[in-house]
């Protein structure tokens, strides 16, 4: 267990390096921070921290910089989440409240997160597995053609144009609408296939062909559309921090283009209010071993509808980044949870 003073020295090294991007020396630490000890004592503490693998010396004439292990200890033991000011919280809330639909909520959220943190921001659309049916609308488009619109409780909209084998009119469309809403409104989407499978057999004979076609469309809308969608913003922010990456910036950008990689990093945040931080090799992605990922879930209650977070260099302001991610997630969850 490190002594408290050495923890303070590590905290000071991380904060100074994040701010300056320059190796930190013992004399500068003693002058800038109220550590209560001499530069010689600070130097001894730094030597101990280096032996433990928390800091390293990039070259012989330089000071020290944090390692992956040092950043990990800083996040776990030393950094608190900075509280946002009332003005900052109000600005976030006002910007998000201007959204007109789910796509706009996601677009605004990912842009805002990228601007606040100056990192690459990623927001996952509400997962189908976490959503429920709010309403189904059926509209006639012609004698044998209908439009089916399914709206989830998170604002996700799925549309299908359906060609019927039998003629349809407004009366039939209304009956289909009523039947589907009676059976599915409030149902979780993951439970919907089992529910709709039995509907045609329960309908009056004249309605069964249309209802069978309609329930097939409902199933297709759940199966054919990708389960998970992501939005990303702020990739240009990586270029401003290119000196922080041991690997080429190109390999990092290529990794971020892979949805499966992003889902692994962001979509795994399944709890609201809990911010997770993966540093360096903890990302389990070779191309991202020079980066850090800060993520959390958003939604109503303790379980997340989706995840959001940022990807940036390990040399980031963790307390501020964690606060920004948590704040945006909180307001997005409240917005999507509003009736």
Swiss-Prot record:
Keywords: Repressor, Stress response, Transcription, Transcription regulation. GO terms for biological process: negative regulation of DNA-templated transcription. One of its GO terms (molecular function) is DNA-binding transcription factor activity. It holds the Pfam family HrcA. Negative regulator of class I heat shock genes (grpE-dnaK-dnaJ and groELS operons). Prevents heat-shock induction of these operons. HAMAP family: HrcA (MF_00081). Belongs to the HrcA family. This is Heat-inducible transcription repressor HrcA. It comes from Frankia alni (strain DSM 45986 / CECT 9034 / ACN14a). The gene is hrcA.
